[in-house]
C-alpha cells in the first residue's frame, strides 16, 4: 500500500543515487565529480517527471496520470485519487442539482433565482408560463427589464421582504410574489398565481352584497307595516293590503332562502352515482300543470315529450333544472308569447329544451346569465319576484349530469335554453 511522501523517502532516494558514485570514487578517485554527476542525474530525472506531470495536467485529456517511480509514485497516485474524489463530488453535486431542479419544476409556484442586482441565473417551467420568461435566452437578464411594473421595482428597491407583494399583470392575472435572500447576494423569488382566489373573494363579496340587497327590500316593507300597525289600528281594505303585502314579501324571502339552500346543496354535492331511474315524462306533466297555473293563460305552452325516454341521475337536481327553465320562460316573457318545451331522444343523448318567441336577450347578457343574482331585466325580475339564482342552479345541476346549459338568443326573435344528457345516462326500457 502506498504511503505519503516523506523526508526519509527523499533522503533514501538521494542516498541510493549516490551509492554508485561512492563506489566508483573509492576505486577510481575523483569522488566529488562522481557525486556531482549522480545529483545532476537525479535532478534531470525529477525534471523529466515534472514535465510529464505538467503535460498530463494541461494537455493530456486522460483521467489516469502517467506512471511514476520512486518518490513520484505516491505523488502521482495521490493526484489520481484526488481527481477521482473530485469527480465523485461533481457527480454527486450534479445529481443534487438535478434533483433540486426536478423538485423546483414540480412546485405549483413560479421560482426564479437571481443575483442581488436582479440578474436571472435560473427559473423553472412555471415561471416561463406565468412570468413569460424564456430560458435559457433570459439568462443574465435583469428581471426588472422583463417585469416592468413600478410596484415590483419599488418592492425590490426597498428590500423589505417581510410581506409578499400582490401584483396584477397586464393580462389581469393576480400574483403573490415573495423574495427570500438565501445566500450571499443571491435571491430566491417565488410567484404564486392567486387569480382564482381573488375571483372567489370577489364572488364572496358580491354574494353577500346581493343577499343583503335582496333581503333589504322585503324587510323594509315588513318593518314599515309593523310600525304602522304599532302606531294605529288598521281596518278594512288597508289592513288586508298590508297583510297581503307582508305575505308576499315573506314568501319572497322564503323563496330566496330555499333557492340559496338548493344552490348550496347542489354545489356541495359529491360526484353522483347516476343510478336513480328518473321518469322525466311524468315530471314534465307536473311541471306543465304548474306552468299553466303560473301563466294564467297569458302565454301559449306547448309540450313535446317522448313518453318512453327516461334517464339515470339525481331526481331532485334534474327537477330543479327543468322546472327553473320552464318557470323562467313563463315569468320573463310577455303575454302572447309561445313557449315550446321539448324532451326528445337524439343520436347524442336525451335533449331537453325550452324555446320561446319572446323579445330575446341581448348578447352582452348571455355569458352572465348563470352567475348568482345576475338579472338581465332587473325591472321585470323585481315584478316577478326573481332572485337571479335559477339559472345558477340549472348550470350546476346539469354539470353534475355531465352536461352543460346552452343559451341561444336573438333579440326580437326569441330565446332557447337547452341541455343534452349523454347517451350513457338514458335508462333502458326493460330496466
Curated annotation (Swiss-Prot):
The gene is phoR. The keyword Glycosyltransferase does not apply. It is a multi-pass membrane protein. The modification Phosphohistidine is found at residue 213. Member of the two-component regulatory system PhoR/PhoB involved in the phosphate regulon genes expression. PhoR may function as a membrane-associated protein kinase that phosphorylates PhoB in response to environmental signals. GO terms for cellular component: plasma membrane. Coiled coil: none annotated. The chain crosses the membrane at residues 14-34, 39-59. Its EC number is 2.7.13.3. Residues 98-166 form the PAS domain. GO terms for molecular function: ATP binding; phosphoprotein phosphatase activity; phosphorelay sensor kinase activity. This is Phosphate regulon sensor protein PhoR. One of its GO terms (biological process) is cellular response to phosphate starvation. It is found in: Cell inner membrane. Residues 210-425 form the Histidine kinase domain. The keyword Kinase applies. It is an enzyme of class 2 (transferase).
Amino acid at each position: 500500500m502506498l504511503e505519503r511522501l516523506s523526508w526519509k523517502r527523499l533522503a533514501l532516494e538521494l542516498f541510493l543515487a549516490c551509492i554508485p558514485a561512492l563506489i566508483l570514487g573509492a576505486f577510481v578517485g575523483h569522488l566529488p565529480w562522481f557525486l556531482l554527476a549522480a545529483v545532476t542525474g537525479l535532478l534531470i530525472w525529477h525534471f523529466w517527471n515534472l514535465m510529464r506531470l505538467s503535460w498530463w495536467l494541461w494537455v493530456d485529456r486522460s483521467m489516469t496520470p502517467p506512471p511514476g517511480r520512486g518518490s513520484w509514485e505516491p505523488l502521482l497516485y495521490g493526484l489520481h485519487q484526488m481527481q477521482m474524489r473530485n469527480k465523485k463530488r461533481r457527480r454527486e453535486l450534479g445529481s443534487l442539482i438535478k434533483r433540486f431542479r426536478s423538485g423546483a419544476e414540480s412546485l405549483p409556484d413560479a421560482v426564479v433565482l437571481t443575483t442581488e442586482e436582479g440578474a436571472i441565473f435560473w427559473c423553472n417551467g412555471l415561471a416561463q408560463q406565468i412570468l413569460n420568461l424564456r430560458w435559457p435566452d433570459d439568462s443574465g437578464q435583469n428581471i426588472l427589464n422583463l417585469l416592468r411594473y413600478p410596484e415590483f421595482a419599488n418592492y425590490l428597491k426597498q428590500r423589505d421582504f417581510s410581506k409578499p407583494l400582490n401584483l396584477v399583470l397586464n393580462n389581469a392575472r393576480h400574483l403573490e410574489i415573495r423574495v427570500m435572500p438565501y445566500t450571499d447576494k443571491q435571491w430566491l423569488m417565488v410567484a404564486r398565481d392567486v387569480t382564482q382566489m381573488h375571483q372567489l373573494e370577489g364572488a364572496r363579496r358580491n354574494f353577500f352584497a346581493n343577499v343583503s340587497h335582496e333581503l333589504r327590500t322585503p324587510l323594509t316593507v315588513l318593518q314599515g307595516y309593523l310600525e304602522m300597525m304599532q302606531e294605529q289600528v288598521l281596518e278594512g281594505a288597508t289592513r288586508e293590503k298590508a297583510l297581503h303585502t307582508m305575505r308576499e314579501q315573506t314568501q319572497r324571502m322564503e323563496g330566496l332562502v330555499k333557492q340559496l339552500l338548493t344552490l348550496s346543496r347542489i354545489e356541495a354535492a359529491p360526484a353522483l352515482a347516476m343510478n336513480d331511474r328518473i321518469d322525466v315524462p311524468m315530471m314534465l306533466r307536473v311541471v306543465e300543470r304548474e306552468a299553466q297555473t303560473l301563466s294564467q293563460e297569458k302565454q301559449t305552452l306547448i309540450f313535446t315529450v317522448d313518453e318512453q325516454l327516461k334517464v339515470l341521475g339525481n331526481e331532485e337536481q334534474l327537477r330543479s333544472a327543468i322546472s327553473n327553465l320552464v318557470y323562467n320562460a313563463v315569468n320573463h316573457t310577455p303575454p302572447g308569447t309561445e313557449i315550446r318545451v321539448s324532451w326528445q331522444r337524439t343520436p347524442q343523448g336525451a335533449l331537453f329544451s325550452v324555446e320561446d318567441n319572446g323579445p330575446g336577450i341581448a348578447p352582452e347578457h348571455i355569458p352572465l346569465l348563470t352567475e348568482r343574482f345576475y338579472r338581465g331585466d332587473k325591472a321585470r325580475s323585481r315584478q316577478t319576484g326573481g332572485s337571479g339564482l335559477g339559472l345558477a342552479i340549472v348550470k350546476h345541476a346539469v354539470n353534475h349530469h355531465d352536461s352543460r346549459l346552452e343559451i341561444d338568443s336573438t333579440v326580437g326573435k326569441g330565446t332557447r335554453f337547452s341541455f343534452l344528457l349523454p347517451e350513457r345516462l338514458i335508462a333502458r326500457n326493460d330496466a
